Amino acid sequence: MKKITSFTIDHTKLNPGIYVSRKDTFENVIFTTIDIRIKAPNIEPIIENAAIHTIEHIGATLLRNNEVWAEKIVYFGPMGCRTGFYLIIFGNYESKDLIDLISWLFSEIVNFSEPIPGASHKECGNYKEHNLDMAKYESSKYLQILNNIKEENLKYP
């Protein structure tokens, strides 16, 4: 079988950051998949389930309610390896184009004080597994990277 693109990235050299994972075109519409890498793979501890679940709920809600980006958001969700998230958006974007949006998103999560969106048994298949404090902690650590972003945090190795 042919390797998928994400498996061709050298994860031993991958830093936390914002990366264009791939671009796809369907019926003349470009979709850009963004790798929101929060942890250095196989070096830092992965994000615990309850925190990543909470970031997913808050993040998806905030992105789909963002006045500028809402109509461009296709998907926001966690990576199976639990080192970050994928964001799929309509349009042709580069990593640097998303710095402000992703910085805003994680800043909002750090300051989030409302009930976690979609965290009831009617709205979520695993509604009991959330941890807002850890979601804020992980988001705060990632913001430190975003606030000092370098080229090595924007292009795959």
Curated annotation (Swiss-Prot):
<dbReference type="InterPro" id="IPR011249">
    <property type="entry name" value="Metalloenz_LuxS/M16"/>
</dbReference>
<protein>
    <recommendedName>
        <fullName>S-ribosylhomocysteine lyase</fullName>
        <ecNumber>4.4.1.21</ecNumber>
    </recommendedName>
</protein>
<comment type="function">
    <text>Involved in the synthesis of autoinducer 2 (AI-2) which is secreted by bacteria and is used to communicate both the cell density and the metabolic potential of the environment. The regulation of gene expression in response to changes in cell density is called quorum sensing. Catalyzes the transformation of S-ribosylhomocysteine (RHC) to homocysteine (HC) and 4,5-dihydroxy-2,3-pentadione (DPD).</text>
</comment>
<keyword id="KW-0408">Iron</keyword>
<dbReference type="GO" id="GO:0043768">
    <property type="term" value="F:S-ribosylhomocysteine lyase activity"/>
</dbReference>
<feature type="binding site">
    <location>
        <position position="124"/>
    </location>
    <ligand>
        <name>Fe cation</name>
    </ligand>
</feature>
<keyword id="KW-0071">Autoinducer synthesis</keyword>
<dbReference type="GO" id="GO:0005506">
    <property type="term" value="F:iron ion binding"/>
</dbReference>
<keyword id="KW-0456">Lyase</keyword>
<keyword id="KW-0673">Quorum sensing</keyword>
<comment type="subunit">
    <text>Homodimer.</text>
</comment>
<dbReference type="InterPro" id="IPR037005">
    <property type="entry name" value="LuxS_sf"/>
</dbReference>
<dbReference type="Pfam" id="PF02664">
    <property type="entry name" value="LuxS"/>
</dbReference>
<comment type="similarity">
    <text>Belongs to the LuxS family.</text>
</comment>
<feature type="binding site">
    <location>
        <position position="57"/>
    </location>
    <ligand>
        <name>Fe cation</name>
    </ligand>
</feature>
<keyword id="KW-0479">Metal-binding</keyword>
<dbReference type="InterPro" id="IPR003815">
    <property type="entry name" value="S-ribosylhomocysteinase"/>
</dbReference>
<dbReference type="GO" id="GO:0009372">
    <property type="term" value="P:quorum sensing"/>
</dbReference>
<feature type="binding site">
    <location>
        <position position="53"/>
    </location>
    <ligand>
        <name>Fe cation</name>
    </ligand>
</feature>
